[in-house]
């Protein structure tokens, strides 16, 4: 298995955890197809000298709610917070359909090669956020300005 590592929630470019371990619910509860695509991409990235870190994967509803509440405090309103953090009802992390990766060289590598695995950057303001949004080798959807644009 490639040197993919799990890190803490939402900390692009800051490694907090150990090796990728599907017994960790942040990884083990990812959609199996997303996880498989991520592992394949990480193997190929490693061949190119890029180590991929998972900074956030599956999140519980309560954790997502805490992140959203913190964003409301930080940005001053729910509308502004939604540009950066989804609610538990709309978060792709809660369903296991999104993963945040780092460090920056891994983000850059996935930006160039992710569609080969079906992995697509979804938001312009979150270069670390990827979802399985196309078939391997397909065309990724247009990148949205931010998470609030999706709703």
Language-model regions: role of each:
Residues 1-151:
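Cell-envelope/glycan interface and biosynthesis
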């Amino acid at each position: 298995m490639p040197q993919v590592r799990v890190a803490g929630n939402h900390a692009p470019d800051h490694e907090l955890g150990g090796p990728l371990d599907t017994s960790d619910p942040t990884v083990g509860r990812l959609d199996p197809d997303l996880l498989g695509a991520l592992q394949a991409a990480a193997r190929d990235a490693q061949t190119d000298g890029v180590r991929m870190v998972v900074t956030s994967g599956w999140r519980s509803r309560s954790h997502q709610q805490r992140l959203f509440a913190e964003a409301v405090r930080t940005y001053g309103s729910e509308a502004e917070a939604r540009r950066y953090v989804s609610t538990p009802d709309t978060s792709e992390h809660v369903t296991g359909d999104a993963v945040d990766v780092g460090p920056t060289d891994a983000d850059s590598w996935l930006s160039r090669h992710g569609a080969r695995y079906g992995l697509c950057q979804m938001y312009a303001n979150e270069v670390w956020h990827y979802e399985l949004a196309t078939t391997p080798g397909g065309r990724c959807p247009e990148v949205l300005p931010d998470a609030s644009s999706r709703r």
